[in-house]
Amino acid sequence: MNQIQVFISGLILLLPGAVDSYVEVKGVVGHPVTLPCTYSTYRGITTTCWGRGQCPSSACQNTLIWTNGHRVTYQKSSRYNLKGHISEGDVSLTIENSVESDSGLYCCRVEIPGWFNDQKVTFSLQVKPEIPTRPPTRPTTTRPTATGRPTTISTRSTHVPTSIRVSTSTPPTSTHTWTHKPEPTTFCPHETTAEVTGIPSHTPTDWNGTVTSSGDTWSNHTEAIPPGKPQKNPTKGFYVGICIAALLLLLLVSTVAITRYILMKRKSASLSVVAFRVSKIEALQNAAVVHSRAEDNIYIVEDRP
């Protein structure tokens, strides 16, 4: 009877070891992942190994890294590191730049002196690709650029949105139809609001100065935003500067041409005056010579008998 009790007690003690239990760890592709493994050093520092697959009866199969308790003595790849305090019992394995092929079972085996005293922990690693996240979209707001007197803008819907509610209970089904007819909206630069309620579906608008947003399924709100200050156009200023420079250059050329024309005219006028004076002097000299010759002829005629 006592032997049967001892046998049953032994089976109960061995039963947990016969069931495989894994510690699940998840990682992301391209990021480091750490498999935690520690042991108590109150009995002293001992050797530890990491391997791929389940822990065998002794040592590690497909060894990745090995430590003697003070430092790493074997390292299969630079991607496998022990970044904890090894001498304090922290032998956690860190896999750098993890990939999907790193997924699988890993064994951390701490060798403790004695029969079947080794500390064995099996990890199940799952490395999945990173899921891209999209930033939330925000509704855009358009501001009208035209300013001045108020203008009237009317909108016309191309369809009549309807909503049908059907009851699946025993009473007869009921149908509710919502109809929206847009009314002309007066748009002012300083205060303009237009509200539309009772629209079951989203109704976009294409005219400037309004933004349509739907908070839920059964109501829409259309709001017109007053125009802001018109933005300056640098291209327009550039063209204005070019036009001013061209006008200044044309004015300078015209001034030079007019000045030169006036100087040439004055020079030609002075030359004509000098020529006129010279011709006048020559005429006077010729007249004097003719007059003297006439007097000589008179004297000659008078001397004859």
From Swiss-Prot:
Signal peptide: 1-21
Result, substituting T137R: In strain: HBA
GO molecular function: phosphatidylserine binding
Disulfide bonds: C37-C108, C49-C60, C55-C107
GO cellular component, one term: plasma membrane
Keyword Oxidoreductase: no
Disrupted gene: phenotype observed: Mutant show progressive loss of IL10 production in B-cells and with age develop severe multiorgan tissue inflammation. Mucin-domain deletion mice exhibit decreased phosphatidylserine binding and are also unable to produce IL10 in response to apoptotic cells. Specific deletion on B-cells results in spontaneous systemic autoimmunity.
Keywords (A to Z) from UniProt: Cell membrane, Disulfide bond, Glycoprotein, Immunoglobulin domain, Membrane, Signal, Transmembrane, Transmembrane helix
Membrane topology (UniProt): Single-pass type I membrane protein
Location(s) in or outside the cell: Cell membrane
Binding partners and assembly: Interacts with STAM. Interacts with SELPLG.
Family: Belongs to the immunoglobulin superfamily. TIM family.
Name assigned to this protein: Hepatitis A virus cellular receptor 1 homolog
